[in-house]
């Protein structure tokens, strides 16, 4: 049993693979190559890392004669005409595929840094063949392709599906852009929070550093005071130390002022940058709200357009269904009309055949009637004449006694004949009976003219047999009756013949009566002949009337049938014409409605195209603005990172200074302790106790400051770590968003490039057509110029010929005048040069006229 076939053909944007011819005897697995299953031309295994091992299934359903494709929980998805069958890692329901569909297994994998496709996906065009070898049906008009009879219908059928797909893709892109904008807004909010936290941490760290500087300065002052108190110096040395201390104080104040000024400047710059960031954030929020409103409006318009498009498609489908129904009704009516026409034609043919058969029967009956009439007349002539002759011969041949003896028998026979003739009424059967009786009579009278009777009997028998054979079919009942009568008569004749010869005397007496009876019989026979002729004429007239009536009835039936047929044909034609007119009107109305709907859908599509272009431009502007905002945010992030690094460096420097100050402070404390131990003996108790108390207070403050410094440093490190982690996360998210935006930008650029290429192709085709038209126009112009030049030349030649003709006519007139003058002179006086002058005139005329003809001829 043959099986269905699926052919996978590689497309240019696909991972390269050989063309696959896969027979679908059973469900075929589509997936990545493994050790047990390698790629081959008769399987659906591909050497591609994007595919899963069990990516999809393809099979052919013999019940419905359809092909199906199912995604079996693939990670990267399966696409039919850029539409995904299911979500990630979910099994899709079986989806019908048609011949010519574009099937994609997986998606392209790209690098974020170089934006280069590292692993391509499988993109193929599938061709499907049924088990009988025929190609499966292609995708219908409402999805991708729509080949219709006219280019207008092609545009009306093809462009809506393409633009609906583009609108769907644009809506998807806009949704993705909105999602990215929301993510960017969230990231900006987190950045703002981080900036606020970093500002607070920096403020607290600066405040802690300032407090620490103050404490250190106080410690130094107190140390100096301790040194001054511990030393017993003179006033000059004390003055010098005071001056040095004042200078140190002044230097510390200047450094503190400069540091404060720098901190204030940095704070002002940070505030300014923060205000700029807030301003840009508000602008981006306004733009986001505007874009969101635009997106909502475009989505509403897209929904309205989709609804209108679906309504138009449904109306077109309804109209097409109505057209099909009307065409079906028209075909049914035509079929019914043809069937009725065929039935009527068959009835007409049957009636004509019956008419021919009836005519043949009528002719046959007419011929039989004529033949029977001729036979009857012939039989009457043949039978009656011999009977008369017999009677005469018998009368003449019989002598006195014999005649007298047989007269009563003859009279009895004549009476019987008259009786039989009166019974039969001139029927041919009675003639046959009469012949039989005559035979019996002649057998009794055998001594009378045997030879003549035998010859007559033989003739009569032959004629009777012929008549019986001719009239056996029509006169069978009369034969039966006549046969019964003849048998009865024969019996009666036998009884009469068996009577004794005693009746001879009676016969003699009745001779005269016999002669009278004979004459009466002759008269009766003549009367019967007349009646028979009249009956024959009446039969002929009745038959003729019957034939005429039958013919008239047939003619009337034929005419009525023809009239019925003509009326039915006219009614059918009228109904067909009316129905055709109605169908034409319906078709015209439907065509007009379809044209109006197509024009309205075209206008809507043109407006949708304009809106799509505007949306493209708005999306491009939004993408460019988003890119600029993203770049500015990246620059600001870089600046913030640089500032954070500067702050970190400053904090590290401050920490180093604090450590150095702590080390110096510890050294000084040790020195002070040594000096205090040395001078403990010198100092008195009250001052030493005061200094110890102050020292303890300062130590406690120093410890508390150290603890605060440790806490602030740990808090600063924690915040720096959080800031670093958040900045890394945000940078990763921003890079991923940037890659997605770049991918969408590339897709939009590819779409714009394809649209531009299509536009360029159309423009090139139009240019070629325009160039061809221009060339044709130039050729026509050249031909026109050539014809104009030829016409001008012909006009000039015509004018020249006209001038020459005019000049020749003038010269001829002059010559005629000269000839007249010469003739007049010749009449007055004979001139011998007259023929010479005529010849010269003719020669000059020929010389002047022939070149003009030669010029005018080309």
From Swiss-Prot:
The chain crosses the membrane at residues 833-853. GO terms for biological process: negative regulation of hippo signaling; protein localization to plasma membrane; regulation of membrane depolarization during cardiac muscle cell action potential; regulation of sodium ion transmembrane transport. Residues 1-832 are cytoplasmic. The modification Phosphoserine is found at residues 150, 472, 476. It comes from the Eukaryota. It is a single-pass type IV membrane protein. One of its GO terms (cellular component) is mitochondrial membrane. Residues 456-470 have a biased composition (Basic and acidic residues). The keyword Cell cycle does not apply. Residues 854-858 are extracellular. Residues 28-85 form the FHA domain. Residues 456-492 are annotated as: Disordered. Residues 169-204, 232-381, 516-829 form a coiled coil. Belongs to the SLMAP family. Alternative spliced transmembrane domains determine subcellular targeting. Isoforms 1, 2, 3 and 4 are targeted to endoplasmic reticulum membrane as well as mitochondrion membrane. Isoform 5 is not targeted to mitochondrion membrane but to endoplasmic reticulum membrane. Homodimer. Interacts with myosin. Interacts with SIKE1 and both associate with the STRIPAK core complex composed of PP2A catalytic and scaffolding subunits, the striatins (PP2A regulatory subunits), the striatin-associated proteins MOB4, STRIP1 and STRIP2, PDCD10 and members of the STE20 kinases, such as STK24 and STK26. Interacts (via FHA domain) with STK3 (when phosphorylated); the interaction associates STK3 with the STRIPAK complex. This is Sarcolemmal membrane-associated protein. It comes from Rattus norvegicus.
């Amino acid at each position: 049993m043959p099986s269905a076939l699926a052919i996978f053909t590689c497309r240019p944007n696909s991972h390269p693979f050989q063309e696959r011819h896969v027979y679908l005897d059973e469900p075929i697995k589509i997936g990545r190559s493994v050790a047990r299953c390698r790629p081959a031309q008769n399987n659906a295994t591909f050497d591609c890392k994007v595919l899963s091992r069990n990516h999809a299934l393809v099979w052919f359903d013999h019940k419905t004669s359809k092909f199906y494709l199912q995604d079996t929980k693939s990670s990267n998805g399966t696409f039919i005409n850029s539409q995904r069958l299911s979500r990630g890692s979910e099994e899709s329901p079986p989806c019908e595929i048609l011949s010519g569909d574009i099937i994609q297994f997986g998606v392209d994998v790209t690098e974020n840094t170089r934006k280069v496709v590292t692993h391509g996906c499988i993109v193929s065009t599938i061709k499907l063949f049924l088990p009988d070898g025929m190609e499966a049906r292609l995708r219908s008009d409402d999805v991708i392709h729509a080949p219709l009879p006219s280019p207008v219908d092609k545009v009306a059928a093809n462009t809506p599906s393409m633009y609906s797909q583009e609108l769907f893709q644009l809506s998807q892109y806009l949704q993705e852009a909105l999602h990215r904008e929301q993510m960017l807004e969230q990231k900006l909010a987190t950045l703002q929070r981080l900036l606020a936290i970093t500002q607070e941490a920096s403020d607290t760290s600066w405040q802690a550093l300032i407090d620490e500087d103050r404490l250190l300065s106080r410690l130094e002052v107190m140390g100096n005071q301790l040194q001054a108190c511990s030393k017993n110096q003179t006033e000059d040395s004390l003055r010098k130390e005071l001056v040095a201390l004042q200078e140190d104080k002044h230097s510390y104040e200047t450094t503190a002022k400069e540091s404060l000024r720098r901190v204030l400047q940095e704070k002002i710059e940070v505030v300014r940058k923060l205000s700029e960031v807030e301003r840009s954030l508000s602008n981006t929020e306004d733009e986001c709200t505007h874009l969101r409103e635009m997106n909502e409006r475009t989505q509403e318009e897209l929904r309205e357009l989709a609804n209108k498009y679906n309504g138009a498609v449904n109306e077109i489908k309804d109209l097409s269904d109505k057209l099909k129904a009307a065409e079906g009704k028209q075909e049914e009516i035509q079929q019914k009309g043809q069937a009725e026409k065929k039935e009527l034609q068959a009835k007409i043919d049957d009636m004509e055949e019956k008419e021919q058969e009836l005519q043949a029967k009528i002719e046959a009956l007419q011929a039989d009637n004529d033949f029977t009439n001729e036979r009857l007349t012939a039989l009457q002539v043949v039978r009656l004449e011999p009977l008369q002759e017999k009677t005469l011969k018998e009368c003449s041949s019989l002598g006195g006694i014999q005649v007298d003896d047989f007269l009563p028998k003859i009279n009895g026979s004549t009476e019987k004949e008259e009786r039989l003739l009166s019974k039969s009424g001139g029927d041919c059967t009675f003639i046959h009976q009469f012949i039989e009786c005559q035979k019996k009579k002649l057998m009794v009278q055998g001594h009378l003219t045997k030879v003549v009777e035998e010859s007559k009997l033989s003739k009569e028998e032959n004629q009777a047999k012929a008549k019986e054979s001719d009239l056996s079919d029509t006169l069978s009942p009369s034969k039966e009756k006549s046969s019964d009568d003849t048998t009865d008569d024969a019996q009666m004749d036998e009884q009469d013949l068996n009577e004794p010869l005693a009746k001879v005397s009676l016969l003699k007496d009745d001779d005269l009566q016999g002669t009278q009876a004979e004459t009466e019989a002759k008269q009766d026979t003549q009367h019967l002949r007349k009646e028979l002729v009249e009956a024959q004429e009446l039969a002929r007239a009745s038959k003729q009337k019957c034939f005429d009536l039958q013919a008239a009835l047939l003619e009337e039936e034929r005419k009525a049938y023809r009239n019925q047929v003509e009326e039915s044909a006219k009614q059918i034609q009228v109904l067909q014409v009316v129905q055709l007119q109605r169908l034409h009107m319906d078709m015209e109305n439907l065509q007009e409605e379809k044209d109006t709907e197509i024009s309205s859908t075209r206008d809507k599509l043109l407006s949708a195209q304009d809106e799509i272009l505007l949306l493209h431009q708005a999306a491009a502007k939004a993408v460019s603005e988003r890119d600029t905002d993203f770049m500015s945010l990246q620059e600001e992030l870089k600046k913030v990172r640089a500032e954070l690094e500067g702050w970190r460096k400053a904090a590290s420097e401050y920490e180093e200074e604090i450590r150095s100050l702590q080390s110096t402070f510890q050294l000084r404390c040790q020195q002070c302790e040594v000096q205090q131990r040395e001078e403990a003996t010198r100092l008195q108790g009250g001052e030493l106790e005061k200094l110890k108390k102050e020292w303890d207070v300062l130590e406690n403050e120093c410890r508390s400051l150290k603890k605060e410094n440790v806490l602030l440093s740990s808090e600063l490190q924690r915040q720096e770590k959080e800031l670093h982690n958040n900045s890394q996360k945000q940078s990763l998210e921003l890079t991923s968003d940037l890659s997605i935006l770049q991918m969408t930008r590339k897709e939009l650029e590819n779409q714009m490039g394809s649209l531009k290429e299509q536009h360029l192709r159309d423009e090139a085709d139009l240019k070629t057509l325009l160039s061809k038209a221009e060339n044709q126009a130039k050729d026509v112009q050249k031909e026109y110029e050539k014809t104009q030049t030829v016409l001008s030349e012909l006009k000039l030649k015509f004018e020249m010929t006209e001038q020459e003709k005019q000049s020749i006519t003038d010269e001829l007139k002059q010559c005629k005048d000269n000839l007249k003058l010469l003739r007049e002179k010749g009449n007055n006086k004979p001139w011998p040069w007259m023929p010479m002058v005529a010849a010269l005139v003719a020669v000059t005329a020929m010389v002047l006229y022939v070149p003009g003809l030669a010029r005018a001829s080309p």
